[in-house]
């Protein structure tokens, strides 16, 4: 190792570095395949080998973060979608979720440390920060993603940026980012839902309906249960009782045991 440091141009050292990087990339690609086929343990094992071969492999760290983020999502689903847990049961599952979110944050921070020009990882970090309610980090990470002109999915980062501003109560900045995201991608379901929330928070019910109605027009394309809850509330506010009741029914049927379904059933019962 000392010889390699002293003689940077030595052929043997250069060959070894290249071979390790190549081997790391092979391991990374294997991990991608395993992850896509839901073989998570095998994917993590290959990623650890990829990092051992090349500790500078930012992609490997990013994928480790995405795997942890997916696991956190699964814990959240246990708490609020497959059932609506309460008390100690919810606390237990939420603790597991938070642990996985912190793990994801740690890995993805390492990825962007190794490769500052990595917009996909910056956007992933923004998504994790939103779930951890770290609004300032979510803003900074999304902005870093948007700085890269080569990023091919800026609407996702813009939607995360707008959502972070929403939670920071900066409604004008939230509107600006989400409106731009939806304007550039009218079929962007999450963007429409978040934009509608901004309009509602500003008291602009008609604009909120304009944003959310295309989302609920096709539940197979936009299966966002919270979107149907929001649409039901908006139509109820406009006096469209039958429409609101139907939207609450659809909402409750989408995931009947979820916390959102409980809300939808409760609001449906309140309609006169």
Model segments located where?
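Residue-level recognition of tetratricopeptide repeat
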Residues: 23, 57, 118, 152-154, ...
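Canonical tetratricopeptide repeat
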Residues: 29, 63, 124, 160, ...
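Structural signature of tandem alpha-helical TPR/SEL1-like repeats
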Residues: 38-46, 74-82, 93-110, 132-144, ...
């Amino acid at each position: 190792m000392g010889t390699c440091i002293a003689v940077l141009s030595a052929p043997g050292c250069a060959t070894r570095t290249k071979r390790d990087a190549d081997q790391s990339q092979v391991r990374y690609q294997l991990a991608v395949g395993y992850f896509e086929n839901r073989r998570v343990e095998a994917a993590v094992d290959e990623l650890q080998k990829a990092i051992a071969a090349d500790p500078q492999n930012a992609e490997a760290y990013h994928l480790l973060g995405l795997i942890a983020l997916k696991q956190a999502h699964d814990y959240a689903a246990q708490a609020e979608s497959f059932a609506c847990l309460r008390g100690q049961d919810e606390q237990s599952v939420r603790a597991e979720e938070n642990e996985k979110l912190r793990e994801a944050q740690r890995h993805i921070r390492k990825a962007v440390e190794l490769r500052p020009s990595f917009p996909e990882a910056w956007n992933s970090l923004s998504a994790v920060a939103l779930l951890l309610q770290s609004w300032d980090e979510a803003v900074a990470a999304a902005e870093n993603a948007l700085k890269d002109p080569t990023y091919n999915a800026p609407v996702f980062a813009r939607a995360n940026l707008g959502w972070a501003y929403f939670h920071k109560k900066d409604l004008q900045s939230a509107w600006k980012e989400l409106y731009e995201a939806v304007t550039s991608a009218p079929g962007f379901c999450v963007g429409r839902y978040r934009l509608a929330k901004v309009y509602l928070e500003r008291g602009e019910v008609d604009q909120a309906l304009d944003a959310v109605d295309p989302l609920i027009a096709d539940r197979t394309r936009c299966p966002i249960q919270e979107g149907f809850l929001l649409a039901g509330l908006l139509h109820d506010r406009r006096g469209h009782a039958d429409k609101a009741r139907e939207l609450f029914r659809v909402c409750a049927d989408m995931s009947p045991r979820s916390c959102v379904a409980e809300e939808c059933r409760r609001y449906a019962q309140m309609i006169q």
